[in-house]
């Protein structure tokens, strides 16, 4: 499909074409086959079953990539850095790395895509889509930051606490992302005052946010629109992190 952003028409008309195209594409996507495959591979997580049902996996993977493509196009309307991001650079292999795990089942039971202008291995904040029966979510943030980068982000939060609070405590953001971070220090990180009024924002071991969703979210015909709206509310958080990381680098 032609990328509407490269069609030489006026900006407003171009955006309208993208929206109409995405709505049509979303209607034609077979999202249920993604859930069918994931449920079946979860119940039959072995190579014999997988090899016998490779066609089902390929269909599920193709539909997930179609979904990601539509989401990328919609995100591009409010985040220009995402324009030109390719689906192949956002997805992950279905095969688990079992070398250091007691769980030797060979296949993942979810499909995920990380939409990031700098690549899925970047420290920068991106947009994550996760489909797993009973554990679907949308998420974003910066994961596993190197210690010096993490310290720089904490310093930016400390120095610009009013701006940061204005982002993460905004009702439009908080309705989808009520908590920042997943793992936390027990006390203030080294170099920051323990009595800082908003020390909870400095205790984060990673600056991430999660929006859990029922399976029905992705099965709904408007899931691309709703996903884009949720990520749009996340963008100021992403901008804060990415500006800080850019400045540090």
Predicted regions and their residues:
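Short, positively charged and aromatic/hydrophobic N-terminal segments
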Residues: 8-25
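Short, structured patches in soluble enzyme cores that scaffold and shape functional sites
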Residues: 117, 142, 211-213
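Ala/Thr-enriched low-complexity intrinsically disordered regions
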Residues: 2-4, 27
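Compact, glycine/acidic-enriched structural inserts
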Residues: 133-186
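Hydrophobic/aromatic-rich structural module bridging two neighboring secondary-structure elements via a short loop
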Residues: 78-122
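Active-site acidic/histidine clusters and adjacent loop/turn architecture
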Residues: 39-92
